[in-house]
Structures are given as C-alpha cells and as structure tokens.
Curated annotation (Swiss-Prot):
It comes from the Bacteria. The gene is rsmA. The lineage of its organism: Bacteria, Bacillati, Mycoplasmatota, Mycoplasmoidales, Metamycoplasmataceae. This is Ribosomal RNA small subunit methyltransferase A. InterPro entries: KsgA/Erm (IPR001737), rRNA_Ade_diMease-like_C (IPR023165), rRNA_Ade_Mease_Trfase_CS (IPR020596), rRNA_Ade_methylase_Trfase_N (IPR020598), rRNA_adenine_dimethylase (IPR011530), SAM-dependent_MTases_sf (IPR029063). It is an enzyme of class 2 (transferase). One of its GO terms (molecular function) is 16S rRNA (adenine(1518)-N(6)/adenine(1519)-N(6))-dimethyltransferase activity. Belongs to the class I-like SAM-binding methyltransferase superfamily. rRNA adenine N(6)-methyltransferase family. RsmA subfamily.
C-alpha cells in the first residue's frame, strides 16, 4: 500500500499513537452513533471509530489520500467525501457526533463553522493545539479568555480531556496538542446564538482596549452610556473581565433596547 506523504501546506500531522486513539474513543459512547470525522488523514483514528460507531462520514481535502483510504476501508461502514469541510453543505437532519484531529492553522475557522451549525451536532471531540484548548476552556480574568472561550462555552459544556505530545504524530509538530470535549447544549435559539456570536466578536475586536473602546466602533456615546448605567460597569472595564452570563445579558440588552 502506498505510504501517505504529509503535506505541510495542509497542516497535516498524522496521528500514529494507538493509546491516544483508544483514549479518544473511550471518552464517548459511540454505539449506534453516526460520526463525522474532519480530515481522516491515514485513517488511523478512523479505524478505531469504525470498530464502535454505527457509521462514519469523513471529509478529506487531500485527494491523494482518497484511493489509499478507499482501499484500506473497503466494505466498511464509511463514506469518504473529498471536500473541504469549510465549504461543505451540511444537509443531514439527524444529529451527528464530530471527532477530529484538526490542522492547527484552520482550527478556529472549523470551530466557528461547527458552531454556526450547532443544531446538527450533539457532541464533539477535537484534537487541537494545546494553546487553543486552553482558550476554549478559559475563565474570565485570565490571559487566554477570548471570543473563542465565550463561543465555545455558550454552545456547549466544554472540558479539556488530556494533553498529547509531539511524539504521537508524524511528522512531529513543534508544540503539544490537547483533546477537548464539547457536550452541546440543547436549549439554544438559532437567532439568539447568531446574535451572541456577532456581539461578542465586536466586544473582543481589540482585546487590549477597554470594553468602551471596543463598543465605540459600532455604538455612539449615548448608547454606550445606556449600557454602562444599566449594568453599572466601571469605565475602565475590559472585555476579558466579564463572564458568560453577563455577555448573554449584554447581547440581549443590545438587541432588545439599542439595535
């Protein structure tokens, strides 16, 4: 069988550690589950998913890997789609579970694509850059707290499961990875979710600035004063000082009283 060659421009670091693959699969009940895998690479993790899941659909952008995967998994409960997940139309109706080892350079884009389609998924397990994992689970008033933290925690109950070292991949990345679990919330409103993402993105547009100096880019002084008076904010408060519940209330206040 032809040996896959990792492509640097696609950010390919193929998982090769059996213990890590087993650990990922052990963290979720895959029985009768239909799985979406984003970028199955050599099919290393795919093999473990197929052992337990009902069906696996894999989005793989690298066309050179397709014949290798098709030969490796012939007659398996697997559908391989040679397409960029970021461009894919997600037309399925029943909720799926996503499990993936994501390329570092497009992690945020893929996350926000998933978040924009939150109604189509129930659980997500992702291998990401360790630094990104820390941002996903970050708490207010910490250096890693960001719009990604808010979006992730608005959409789901999130948990950083474990760190994965460079030796678990080929080729070895220069940094650690981590596996993060998302248990998606079931009571979300699509319109309010979209509004929340938009509003928090605006609030974190310039992270080094105060909240006021972020809001001034899309609100006038009177509107900001109305917000500050209602929430009794200090003038110098910064975006990273406010928790998720406050941002939910802020977004609701903006769209109900100002927008």
């Amino acid at each position: 069988m032809q040996k896959p060659v990792p492509k640097k421009h696609l950010g390919q670091n193929f998982l090769k550690d059996r213990k890590i693959a087993e650990k990922i699969v052990e963290n979720i009940d895959l029985k009768n589950k239909e799985i979406i895998e984003i970028g199955c690479g050599t099919g290393f993790l795919t093999n473990f998913l197929l052992e337990k899941a009902k069906f696996v659909t894999c989005y793989e952008i690298d066309r050179n890997l397709i014949p290798i995967l098709e030969k490796k998994f012939k007659n398996k409960n697997l559908r391989i789609i040679n397409e960029d997940f970021l461009l894919a139309e997600l037309e399925f109706k029943e909720k799926k579970t996503i499990i993936a080892n994501l390329p570092y350079y497009i992690t945020s884009k893929i996350l926000f694509k998933i978040f924009a389609n939150f109604e189509k998924f129930d659980k997500i397990i992702l291998m990401v850059q360790n630094e990104v994992a820390d941002r996903i689970v970050a708490k207010p008033k910490t250096p890693t707290y960001s719009k990604l933290s808010l979006a992730s925690q608005y959409i789901a109950h999130v948990k950083k499961l474990f760190v994965v070292g460079p030796d678990s991949f080929f080729p070895k990345p220069k940094i650690n990875s981590a596996v993060v679990f998302f248990d998606l919330r079931t009571n979300l409103d699509a319109k309010k979710t979209e509004q929340f993402f938009w509003f928090t993105k605006k609030c974190f547009q310039f992270k080094r600035k105060t909240l006021y100096n972020n809001l001034i880019f899309f609100l006038n002084k009177q509107q900001i004063e109305k917000i500050y008076n209602f929430f009794q904010f200090a003038q110098n408060i910064r975006p990273q000082q406010l928790d998720l519940v406050t941002y939910i209330r802020l977004a609701d206040f903006y769209f109900n009283n100002i927008f």
